[in-house]
Amino acid sequence: MDSKYASIGREKPKITNDLTVKRLKLCVNNANTKKDKEQTNNGAASNNKLENNFSKENTEDLKEARKSLPVYLVRARIIEEIKKHDTMILIGETGSGKTTQIPQLIHEHRLEGKSCVAVTQPRRVAAITLALRVAAEMNTDIGSIVGYSVRFEDVTSPRTKVKYLTDGMLLREAVSDPLLKKYSVIVLDEAHERTVNTDVLFGIVKLAQKERNGQKQNPLKVIVMSATMDVDSFRKYYDNCPVIYLEGRTYPVTIYHSKIKHEDYQYAAICTIFQLHTTTPANEDFLVFLTGQEEIETVMTNIKQIAKETVGPQIRVCPLYAGLPAAKQLLVWKKTPPGMRKIVLATNIAEASVTIPEIRYVIDTGVVKERTWCTRTGAERLSVVPCSQAASWQRAGRAGRTAPGASYRLYTATDFKCRRQHNLPEIVRCPLTSTVLMLIATGLDPATFPLIDTPPKDSIHAALLLLKELGAVDNESNPKLTVLGKKLTAFPIDPKYAKILLCAPEYGCLEEVILMERIKH
């Protein structure tokens, strides 16, 4: 029987013949077991154990691994370019080692001086795991020379010289310190993500660099990094700064496209998982891309049900999504015993930055959740849409980090060619209330703030109008923060919900509001 996949690249034995798997009704496991509660309560302890696992890796092995990375082989040229230019763009293919090695090289050559190197990440799990890895490579305790800062968790000290943090955390620091004086080098990683926070950070850092150089203060160096991004737009934005390209160290990845369109991509993913599971060796792990927690829990429940009736290696299913507690997120990196296969069910959180060892097969559903809103009604919507071509390649690259692999795309080659090349920037499709409030708090004019892509005027006007209605600013034409507005900036949440929290004690419903906020986030 023909494979339901068309391959790109070299031919490979067909491993996707139909299985006698009955089609079952997909179900969601909502049970809160005693075991789940115990794991949640012991989350901090698990987190500490996993941090210890990072640090216990053989130091000599880590040193040898560093030396084999492409970025390490051209380290002299990179350091020379950083010394020569205040701003540079670095395009490094998957596996080049740019995210872990560039900050270390800067520190080893003392280019940060008496200040600190900041490395931004769009997601919290990436900031944490990268910091743990770099601390292990530098043979230091996390929170000492190397640290991280994410929402509600700051693991740094006065000694910290390399700091991994989410872009949102650096934005909050800019409110009290617009010139970002505590940093001498800022690395803006995963620039292709184009979240609202990353786009605003580009402008904040650009203005801080210009102001510091104009005042003859400690100069600020900026390094913009990505594996896939629109280089021309970024280069133009940063005044034609130099661009350096790094080769990757990826292994061959064979791409297979579905020959037909799948209406039910969850079912297609489950079928593909077990077709591969029964025909490939154990300890060759799978990474499956889904759109959110509900889908992940649904697929996880069905995998466990089917595994009971299917021959093959034992299975460990690991979820990975933004709302998962940090301790459970880090379980993804825990090695499985011999003879057991790990299946990681992840959102696009696993597309970039983080490397999950032993992933040999990627199952790409080809979809992602995208946030949009209507300026007329103010209603937000989270829709499942096709991911971009760049995202598809990023996903495929997860299979080739440590060994040759394959990516099974549950969509046709024609469908892939019709997709947009890059992600649509969030700033042109999302509400900007929080962003505008932050810019005003930083002393910047939202109307003239330099952005790579200019948001619709209706978006900025709607944000100013809402802030005025909330009482956060005094007027719309030349907005200044009110006393309430200053209080709202202290909360890392939407200004609407921040005001609800502030007003809740007056109405005696603080606990209920906190519970609602917790559910929402």
Predicted feature residues:
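C-terminal helical accessory/scaffold domains
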Residues: 510-521
